[in-house]
């Protein structure tokens, strides 16, 4: 049974500008240490911005699917890829529901779609 759905779209050049202006301060506020560490495999600023934009969209989409951001911060939500490259989302707070995640990017935009099932 579907509990909620959420979607978000992020303008990648905006994330790139934020990274240039605020750097680690921005990253440490939104992303987990592991997400930041995994981003280091990308050598170019453009690829890192794309990586973080998709994860930001996923976090926002999850909050929308949940119906509220109360009691949860962005760092409670982590986005990874399995060995086949499929994205998945974990939540550090007690959250038992099954979460489905789809990420995409094209040109200047990154999108995420989340379905929460109970």
UniProtKB/Swiss-Prot annotation:
EC number: 2.7.8.7
Gene Ontology terms: cellular component: cytoplasm
Keywords: Cytoplasm, Fatty acid biosynthesis, Fatty acid metabolism, Lipid biosynthesis, Lipid metabolism, Magnesium, Metal-binding, Transferase
Any one GO molecular-function label of the UniProt entry: magnesium ion binding
EC primary class: transferase
Required cofactor names: Mg(2+)
GO biological process: fatty acid biosynthetic process
InterPro entries, per the entry: 4-PPantetheinyl_Trfase_dom, 4-PPantetheinyl_Trfase_dom_sf, ACPS, Ppantetheine-prot_Trfase_dom
Annotated catalysed reactions: apo-[ACP] + CoA = holo-[ACP] + adenosine 3',5'-bisphosphate + H(+)
Chain sites annotated for binding Mg(2+): 8, 60
Chief location: cytoplasm
Compartments (UniProt record): Cytoplasm
Coiled coil stretches, renumbered: none
Function field: Transfers the 4'-phosphopantetheine moiety from coenzyme A to a Ser of acyl-carrier-protein.
HAMAP family: AcpS
Family designation: Belongs to the P-Pant transferase superfamily. AcpS family.
Listed name of the protein: Holo-[acyl-carrier-protein] synthase
Organism, scientific name: Wolbachia sp. subsp. Drosophila simulans (strain wRi)
